[in-house]
């Protein structure tokens, strides 16, 4: 869709189009469309601005990533659809590994996400080789399946766009 730059919600609509494209390309689960809509509604309610609290959290996360010995960036379908190049740039800047980790588990979708991240410049993407899988005992969701060299061994994990079970 060609969204006019003059539209008052140009940025939001452009992001929405990336999510839809990600769904059509097999990166985003249909439930990911709903999750994005929920986040978009919340963003609208807070005035589509980054709060001071969020800015402080971003800075704290950056410090944690930079001081970690084994940082990992966890990527789901929505993240892969919205900002694969930025994930790769952040991983390079922080010496972090990248791992695909999904709630709506699908090996085919994992491979598509891996391909998208590699196209964006990632040299290595963890979380797609069943021989490297381990389970985190305290989680009941499919997100408990992680890579032995990634999230399983990490001292810091950045989980963008998270709404629950892994970040408590």
Where are these regions (language model features)?
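Electropositive, gly/pro-rich neighborhoods at or near active sites that engage anionic ligands
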Residues: 1-97, 107-109
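Active-site glycine-rich loop that binds ribose-phosphate moieties when present
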Residues: 131-152, 156-167
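Long, charge-dense
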Residues: 93-144
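A short secondary-structure junction signal
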Residues: 85, 167-168
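Short His-Asn-centered micro-motif
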Residues: 74-77, 101-102, 158-162
